[in-house]
Amino acid sequence: MAKIGMDLNSFILEQERLYPNATGSLSRALVAIESATKVIASHVRMAGLADILGMAGKKNIQGEEVQKLDELSNNLLIQYLSQSGEFFALASEELDEPIFPEEGKDAKYVIAFDPLDGSSNIDVNISIGTIFSIHRRVNSDVSDFLQEGYKQVAAGYVIYGSSTMLVLSTGNGVNGFTLDPAVGMYLLSHPNMKIPEKGKIYSINESNDKKWIDAGLKEYIESLKDEGYTSRYIGSMVADVHRTLIKGGIFAYPADVKNKNGKLRLLYEASPMAFLTVQAGGIATTGKEDILNIKPTDIHQRVPVFLGGKYEMEKLKSMLKNG
């Protein structure tokens, strides 16, 4: 039985014991993620002193400016995940194509990740994070990444804020672990996380409301205001979703006239966050279909995202349908 204060490694081993045929491969894979994010956390804390803030002078596959800390985080994850030998392939927001580490040629899993979500906020000291999604290796090629979200073996994120916290699900609920820098360990601080069925916060960039293309969305937001909801929008998906998981409400990044297919990436942003939301008792949709039911067609595919508690999400689906 997991107890508050249990370290992440012990928790992972305890979960492994629930599966008599487990080989330990997933456990070792998760430990590799744990190790990499601890190092990233240390660099985030020192970023202002180490000349790793600002732009790296290049653009990623999305055409976005790469931040120096983004590039460092990406390299650290590639290093640790490759050396673990537990991943057949790695896909990143910062890579045009997946890489296939020599050490992972016999591995069981593939992983997609956003090394540093919200990196445009680095210079202003706002919470940022790492998001990851693990699938089973099936066909031993790029198509292993193009599996529906409900087939994820594990998903999670690490938020680098006032404290560093890793939020994880292996399909048996959601648990949060806070990094104790004194001992260098993630300790269970938020066991069995559940999103409230009804919250008081909506999180969306309302400055884009004239560009939204979902009929009924403006009316939906106005109806939440009429119910006394308050707006909280940070612009860092990890931070906004983290608050939504804990306090309830809704997080939304809808399609608009500029981004008709949505802005957030399915594989390493929308899908893992949807997995966590559903595991925590919430709902995640594009406005038209459940995010976890989408079969990806491209590694960097984008989708609209709405996720949150049952009350807000059921109301959203009803108003978008009738909008």
Swiss-Prot record:
InterPro entries from the UniProt entry: FBPase_C_dom, FBPase_class-1, FBPase_N, FBPtase, Fructose_bisphosphatase_AS
PANTHER family, per the entry: FRUCTOSE-1,6-BISPHOSPHATASE-RELATED (PTHR11556), SEDOHEPTULOSE-1,7-BISPHOSPHATASE, CHLOROPLASTIC (PTHR11556:SF35)
Organism whose genome encodes this protein: Sulfurihydrogenibium sp. (strain YO3AOP1)
Free-text cofactor note: Binds 2 magnesium ions per subunit.
Annotated pathway: Carbohydrate biosynthesis; gluconeogenesis
Residues that bind substrate: 117-120, 205, 233, 263
Protein family per UniProt: Belongs to the FBPase class 1 family.
Full protein name: Fructose-1,6-bisphosphatase class 1
Pfam families per UniProt: FBPase, FBPase_C
Record keywords: Carbohydrate metabolism, Cytoplasm, Hydrolase, Magnesium, Metal-binding
EC number(s) given by UniProt: 3.1.3.11
Assembly description: Homotetramer.
Catalysis: reaction(s): beta-D-fructose 1,6-bisphosphate + H2O = beta-D-fructose 6-phosphate + phosphate
